[in-house]
Each structure stands twice: as C-alpha cells, then as structure tokens.
Amino acid sequence: MPALRFLALLASLLATSRVGLATLADIVGGRRAQPQEFPFLASIQKQGRPFCAGALVHPRFVLTAASCFRGKNSGSASVVLGAYDLRQQEQSRQTFSIRSISQNGYDPRQNLNDVLLLQLDREARLTPSVALVPLPPQNATVEAGTNCQVAGWGTQRLRRLFSRFPRVLNVTVTSNPCLPRDMCIGVFSRRGRISQGDRGTPLVCNGLAQGVASFLRRRFRRSSGFFTRVALFRNWIDSVLNNPPA
C-alpha cells in the first residue's frame, strides 16, 4: 500500500443536492485489519475479482451502493462473506449469488439515493467471521468528534491490484462546512484517505453503519469522499427486510 500520508478527508453523508464527478473509493494507507474485526464486511465480486464492498445487515441482505451495479448485470456477480485473505480459500468464507436487488430512486446523474440492498440466494450462517452490522435510527445524526472507521480491500493505487487483506482507516468527525445544500459530515484522518476501489463499503461510527461509500470529489487539492447517509433510508431498508421480494 502507499506510504501513510497526512491529509484531510471530508467524507460526506449525502441525501440531496448535485455534487461532483463520481469515482470508486478505496482505503489508501491506514492499517491492516485484524481477522474477524469487521465480520459484517462483504466482498462483491465478478468472476472472482472484487469490484465493490458492502455490509451484511440481515442474514439475507447486504447493503451497498446502487452505483456499484450501474451498467452491470447482477446475475453475473457474487457476494463473499467471511473473507479475510483474498488469495486464500478460507473455510470461513460463504459465497452467494444475488437473487434480487432493491433500489430507492437512485439518480446517477445527480448522485442521489446511492443505496442498494442485495438479496442473497439463501440465508448467511452467522459465525465469528460472518455477523450483522447494526443500523442507525431513521434521521439520526453523527456529532462532531465521533470516531468512525472505514474498511475494505480497495486497490493499491500504484499497481491497481486489490489489497490481499482488508485495510481500515480510523477517522474523526469534524465540523468542517460542506457545500451549500449538501447534507454531510466531515471526517479527518492523518493516516490515509479514500480513493479508488471500495465503493459501497460502510462508514462505521460507534458500531453503527452510518454511511455507504458513494463517490469522490477533488477540489483545491483535497479529496472529499462522499457517503450516502444510511439514517435517511432506515425506514425504506426496514420495509425491504420485512417484506422481501418474492
């Protein structure tokens, strides 16, 4: 992975407003995660190659970004739970096909409502390596000073290879201002940043999945990572989980 670097990362939880160009997101810098540290983390793959991440929120559902499947056929994708070393066929792994996808008005032109639920072909077996992540209540906010984490197997920036092990970035919510009409929170990290490779991975604050990695924006030599604000979609998520597609 690239050397650790100092830089401010403005990670925004979006609900409305038009924002900049969308790209993938991955963890650059940070540290290597420990085994079973993020048992809810899902690797979304096509032909064995990761292209997005997500979080297990129900034994049959993974929460990720709708932009992950823009122009992609979900029938050719798979979801891997319980993975740690992507180069090994670990006994902890559980691999699923996707039975259905549920969106909530995703608008790719304006990057709105970039959230998606993947229904797995069967229930995941919960183990120390496969667990559910709790979600925040509807309309909940994250206060400045809150410590959060982002984890994933994002690409190594120089060689464009996916990380063998998940990387984790510790961030702290700040009171940095956002652009007009943006609904966001800022986070600051001295150990890395989000760049390309892990769209859909969760932003976890106090044990709750508060955000879903959506896209990046570069402005004034700074990279701002934007996360869909999960709390704005909690009621919709519950409606899908309680009434799954047939």
Curated annotation (Swiss-Prot):
SUPFAM superfamilies: Trypsin-like serine proteases. Pfam families: Trypsin. Residues 1-19 form the signal peptide. SMART domains: Tryp_SPc. GO terms for biological process: antimicrobial humoral response; cell chemotaxis; defense response to virus; glial cell migration; intracellular signal transduction; microglial cell activation; monocyte extravasation; neutrophil-mediated killing of bacterium. GO terms for molecular function: heparan sulfate proteoglycan binding; heparin binding; serine-type endopeptidase activity. Residues 27-242 form the Peptidase S1 domain. Keywords: Antibiotic, Antimicrobial, Chemotaxis, Disulfide bond, Glycoprotein, Heparin-binding, Membrane, Serine protease homolog, Signal, Zymogen. One of its GO terms (cellular component) is azurophil granule membrane. Its main location: membrane. Glycans are attached at N139, N170. It is found in: Cytoplasmic granule membrane. It is a peripheral membrane protein. This is a neutrophil granule-derived antibacterial and monocyte- and fibroblast-specific chemotactic glycoprotein. Binds heparin. Belongs to the peptidase S1 family. Elastase subfamily. This is Azurocidin.
